[in-house]
Curated annotation (Swiss-Prot):
InterPro entries: 3'-5'_exoribonuclease_YhaM, HD/PDEase_dom, HD_domain, NA-bd_OB-fold, NA-bd_OB_tRNA, YhaM_exoribonuc/phosphodiest. Belongs to the YhaM family. This is 3'-5' exoribonuclease YhaM. One of its GO terms (biological process) is rRNA 3'-end processing. The gene is yhaM. Shows a 3'-5' exoribonuclease activity. Pfam families: HD, tRNA_anti-codon. One of its GO terms (molecular function) is nucleic acid binding. Its EC number is 3.1.-.-.
Length: 324
């Protein structure tokens, strides 16, 4: 099996096919245009600069294009970067497909669907259960295909559903630890909190923000969807407002995107488990790229910190049959 792009080390030469994940145009100090490419395969992505680009280059090297790249890996300000020596678009004779380069959730779609369905059927409040079932059914295809974000955490195929499954497991453990928590409300909040991203984002590949995503955002979108679902189902009552509050407050603070802070116990828990699972995903994926005894690249979303991979922990994981 060919080595993944994130497993190359500084100084190594690269001669591989990669998928363009995103492209950003810039102007260099000499006044000439350049492109910042984020290139990916199934293992992750890497940044590369394409200097002195022409208008033709800008029209050719676009997201979702497959390219053949020859270059070298180097470290730039604490992050791995691919220095391009030559680049071309892949052609039909190269026999490569976009799906060959897409990172996917480490859990089968049908298994995630089964897990989430179990949690829905564990709900005893009929209003909360019906709204949750209705909305999940309405957006089922996209929910199980979309990433949870464009960057930082769970930004891979089926990342949204995988994020929700992980959060439901955390929620279940906390409900068992704190029996006073409303299980139905917390489970529903977990399932619905990011469902608006199927409208906010453009799709599962090279996701970008839609018009609704830019002007509204996934939080207000889902608050509106809950209201429409309740009206369609003929449901009224306090549950609707509280469920909307769960979604509205899950980012925790106004400066993080929530118009209201959590003011219901389950909303507070939802905020913390969402934050925890997102951060663990960022850290784990960064640690996968380094060897025991090394530090990760700086993680911008985590105050630009690097994380160390202890040697003794890796030995223990291997003894248990896990991965290090």
């Amino acid at each position: 099996m060919a080595k993944g792009i994130v497993h190359y080390e500084v100084g190594e030469q690269v001669d591989v096919y990669l998928l363009i994940k995103s492209v950003t145009k810039g102007i260099a100090s000499n006044g000439k245009p350049f492109l910042t490419l984020i290139l990916q395969d199934k293992t992750g992505d890497i940044e590369a600069k394409l200097w002195d680009v022409s208008p033709e280059d800008e029209s050719v090297y676009v997201p979702e294009s497959i390219v053949k790249v020859l270059g070298d890996i180097h470290n730039y300000r604490g992050k791995m970067q691919l220095k391009i020596r030559s680049i071309r678009l892949a052609h039909e004779g190269d026999a490569v497909r976009v799906s060959d380069f897409l990172e996917t959730a480490p859990m089968k779609r049908e298994d995630m669907m089964e897990k989430i369905t179990e949690y829905i059927f564990a709900m005893q409040n009929p209003n909360i259960q019906r709204i949750t079932r209705y909305l999940l059914k309405k957006y089922e295809q996209k929910f199980f295909d979309y990433p949870a974000a464009t960057k930082n955490h769970h930004e891979f195929i089926s990342g949204l559903a995988y994020h929700v499954v992980s959060m439901l497991e955390l929620a279940k453990a906390l409900v068992n630890l704190y029996p006073s928590l409303n299980r139905d409300l917390l489970y529903a909040g977990v399932i619905l909190h990011d469902l608006g991203k199927v409208i906010e984002l453009s799709g599962p590949v090279s996701a970008s923000y839609t018009l609704e995503g830019k002007l509204l955002g996934h939080i207000p979108i889902m608050v509106g969807e809950i209201s429409k679902a309740a009206e369609h189902l003929g449901i009224s009552g306090e549950e609707i407002v509280v469920l909307q509050h769960m979604v509205l407050s899950h980012h925790g603070k106004a400066e993080w995107g929530s118009p209201k802070p959590p003011m219901v116990k389950e909303a507070e828990i939802l905020h913390y488990i969402d934050n925890l699972d997102a951060k663990m995903n960022m850290i784990d994926r960064a640690l996968e790229k380094v060897k025991p005894g090394e530090f990760t690249e700086r993680i911008y979303a985590l105050e630009n910190r690097s994380f160390y991979k202890p040697i003794f922990s890796s030995v223990l994981m291997q003894e248990r049959g896990g991965t290090s």
